[in-house]
Amino acid sequence: MMRIRKVILSIFAFLFLITSNAYADKVRIATEGAYPPWNSKSPDGKLIGFEVELANVLCGYMGHECTIVEQDWDGMIPALRMRKYDAIMAGMSITDERKKVITFSQGYADEVASLAVMKGSSLESLKTVEAVNLSKGAKKTLKTLTTALAGKTVGVQVGTIHQNFLESGDVGKVNVRTYKTQDEVNLDLAAGRIDVALAAAVAFTDYAEKSGKPVVLVGPTFSGGAFGNGVGVGLRQEAQFGSSTAMGKRDGQLLKDFNKAIKKASKDGKISELAIKWFGFDASM
């Protein structure tokens, strides 16, 4: 009886080892495919962008077989927690609020936010300091913005740090209009259906370059505070399924793998190279 039991346990251990190794080598990474130049789609429907190329670089360093899948932004975190995929690379800023439900790798790129208007807007002359880090305080600048945005309709993508900032009260009571994608924000800004928009600065410059529309960045660039501390890979918290379970251990190992790969990609200059290619400047951290 003991011998049979040992054989059965050995079989289970062997099967678990095979399954775990196969599972660990296959990583599904979600991106939105609608936030250029971070991530978008080519005319033939292929996922492209800074994060798509970076994901492939990181997977090569990790030795994992990766599949990049498309996911709507507003369902990004819930689907990760439901194990629809293993990681998120979608221009997702590292914020304290998000860290309550998921974990992040170390940051791989800086993202600064900016307000944008169409040329000729009354807000085009808005002058403030060049850059604002909300973690260090910016009362004077926020007061200026509160006055400037009073009565204006500001467009943002739903579920973003930009929406959270506008609704925080830091710039008074603002008429916020939300959109499912950044593309929709850009189109309504160009059509005059909103007065001003808030998003990553590169999202506006990319749109202006590709569309030829006279989009103008105004006011300061924002970082810190509600805007987070850079962009990283979103991952499940190891404790979500128990740190001692196979799934929990796998999630914990994946975090280590991504951190190691990001450090290598940073040291090798690959992140800088891709950032310059897609953003026009070095946004690596």
Predicted ranges, named:
Residues 56-70, 148-153, 168-184, 191-193:
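A local structural motif
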Residues 33, 110-114, 209-256, 261-278, 281-285:
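Periplasmic-binding protein-like
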Residues 74-78, 91-101, 164-169, 195-230, ...:
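A ligand-binding cleft/hinge motif common to bilobed small-molecule-binding domains
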